[in-house]
UniProtKB/Swiss-Prot annotation:
Quaternary context: Part of the 50S ribosomal subunit. Forms a cluster with proteins L14 and L19.
PROSITE patterns linked to this entry: RIBOSOMAL_L3 (PS00474)
Keywords: Ribonucleoprotein, Ribosomal protein, RNA-binding, rRNA-binding
Gene Ontology BP annotations: translation
GO cellular component, one term: cytosolic large ribosomal subunit
InterPro entries hit by this protein: Ribosomal_uL3, Ribosomal_uL3_bac/org-type, Ribosomal_uL3_CS, Transl_B-barrel_sf
Gene: rplC
GO molecular function terms noted in the UniProt entry: rRNA binding; structural constituent of ribosome
Family: Belongs to the universal ribosomal protein uL3 family.
Cited function: One of the primary rRNA binding proteins, it binds directly near the 3'-end of the 23S rRNA, where it nucleates assembly of the 50S subunit.
Organism annotation: Fervidobacterium nodosum (strain ATCC 35602 / DSM 5306 / Rt17-B1)
Cystines in this chain: none
Descriptive protein name: Large ribosomal subunit protein uL3
Length: 207
């Protein structure tokens, strides 16, 4: 199982095998192993990775203690990854984008763009009302339920509300190219989230 933490840089296109391939560029790593979790002590096997160095003044004293115990520099992002054998890793070990190869299949988890409180037409692609003269509703929701029976709105009814900022995983994305010197990874297709947003990269589970 390969994994790393990254940030979305943006999209571009590459020329490969006489075809234009749309790719998303990710700045992946370098990450540092901050902590190891074991079945005996914590009930499960996992390692905790740190990403992006940060000034000590921006962290609380308990968080600083975690990094001082591991003897590593303070990190902005901490994420846990389940592993079968924690003995393969050591605290302070650096994990870079070089662990991946061109053609690898990976799963990418990100958070979609937050669009705030949105109406039913934008959030659920509702048709809306008539646009002609005389109509008193154009972008409204419409009927949401009956009056006398059942005299309530059913759970799950699609209505206006907060739209976006949801955790989404893209399965089986293909690694197109790697720039290990600059910690860059180019994957085929799109990746959820805005430019600069955080993404989690793992080896594909369903291949």
């Amino acid at each position: 199982m390969k994994f790393i933490i990254a940030r979305k840089v943006g999209m571009t296109r590459l020329w490969k095998d006489e075809k234009v391939v749309p790719v998303t560029v990710l700045k992946a790593g370098p990450c540092v192993v901050v902590q190891k979790k074991t079945v005996e002590k914590d009930g499960y096997n996992a390692i905790q990775l740190g990403f992006e160095e940060v000034n000590e003044k921006k962290l609380t004293k308990p968080m600083l203690g975690v990094f001082k115990k591991a003897n590593v520099k303070p990190m902005r992002v901490l994420k846990e990854f389940r592993v079968e054998n924690v003995d393969q890793y050591s605290v302070g070990q650096e994990i870079t984008v070089a662990i991946f190869q061109e053609g690898d299949k990976i799963d990418i988890t990100g958070w979609t763009k937050g669009r705030g409180y949105s109406g039913a037409m934008k959030r659920w692609n509702f048709q809306g009302g008539p646009k002609a003269h005389g109509a008193k509703f154009h972008r409204e929701l419409g009927s949401v339920g009956q009056h006398t029976e059942p005299a309530r709105i059913f759970k799950g009814k699609r209505m206006p509300g907060r739209y976006g900022n949801e955790r989404v995983t893209i399965l089986n994305s293909e690694v197109v190219t790697i720039d290990a010197q600059n910690n860059l990874l180019a994957v085929k297709g799109g990746v959820p989230g805005a430019r600069g947003s955080l993404v989690i990269i793992r080896s594909a589970v369903k291949q």
